[in-house]
From Swiss-Prot:
HAMAP family, A to Z: Endonuclease_8
Protein family per UniProt: Belongs to the FPG family.
Residues the entry annotates as binding DNA: 70, 125, 169
Protein name (database record): Endonuclease 8
Length: 263
């Protein structure tokens, strides 16, 4: 599943295609969304926001399209009039004079009013987004030490969108390697230096992934600045200590680590 940097990059591409342009045609696959087709035609997309792995497409009439790609959903940008070659099932089409964005295969799609945005179950449950520039390491540290999260092992905590939105497995692996910790640790057991290092890494690594490339290719490195240090590198030498990177399973997900320098 794509993680926060990939979702934000996808949103950037969608915004670049249609933001600020009048919608010339709107189509939804689901019956409950059909009434909104006429309401949105002629409106403009004002911005596309990410909340972790969910996308919020905001329209000029105050409505917001909520979509969560889950495992199979994917957005695409095409030239208007182009017929894409795909076997995927189309769910949403937002068309302007020159560009069209398409959502395929997703099933978690809703139209929300401004009031409904504040009460939506997923949006209420999800934590602060790691790519939100307003989120600081100090706030992350306070969240780590809060009664809700301080007793949680990092193996599960760093996958929990209620803790920090946008984290996922490759980010979990790389963050813990960066700070030299294993997934069995809990925030309550860390010293001040470890807490500070982890609080910064929880923001720095996702943001570096987003700004340098932001696309998940699990068999290749991430751009020139951010590259995988341990993810999918089992059997290779750790660049920090020379130990051999190992692969195991934590919280039902593949986990890569260096037993020599992650303690």
């Amino acid at each position: 599943m794509p993680e926060g940097p990939e979702i934000r990059r996808a949103a950037d591409n969608l915004e670049a295609a249609i933001k600020g342009k009048p919608l010339t045609d709107v189509w939804f696959a689901f019956a409950q969304l059909k009434p909104y087709e006429s309401q949105l035609t002629g409106q403009i997309v004002t911005r596309i926001e990410t909340r972790g792995k969910a996308l919020l497409t905001h329209f000029s009439n105050g409505l917001t399209l909520y979509s969560h790609n889950q495992l199979y959903g994917v957005w695409r940008v095409i030239d208007t009039g182009e017929i894409p070659k795909t076997t995927r099932i189309l769910r949403v089409r937002l068309q302007t004079a020159d560009k069209t964005i398409l959502l395929y295969s997703a099933s978690d799609i809703e139209m929300l009013t401004a009031e409904q945005l504040t009460t939506h179950p997923f949006l209420q449950r999800v934590g602060p987004d790691v790519l939100d520039a307003r989120l600081t390491p100090e706030e992350v540290k306070a969240r780590l030490l809060s009664p809700r999260f301080r007793n949680r092992q990092f193996s599960g905590l760093l996958l929990d969108q209620a803790f920090l939105a946008g984290l996922g497995n490759y980010l979990r692996v790389e963050i813990l390697w960066q700070v030299g910790l294993t997934g069995q640790h809990k925030a309550k057991d860390l010293n001040e230096a470890q807490l500070n290092a982890l609080s910064h890494a929880l923001l720095d690594i996702p943001r570096l992934s987003y700004t340098t490339r932001g696309q998940a290719d699990e068999n290749k490195h991430h751009g020139a600045l951010f590259r995988f240090k341990v993810f999918h590198r089992d059997g290779e030498a750790c660049e920090r200590c020379g130990g051999i990177i190992e692969k195991t399973t934590l919280s039902s997900r593949p986990f890569y680590w260096c037993p020599h320098c992650q303690k």
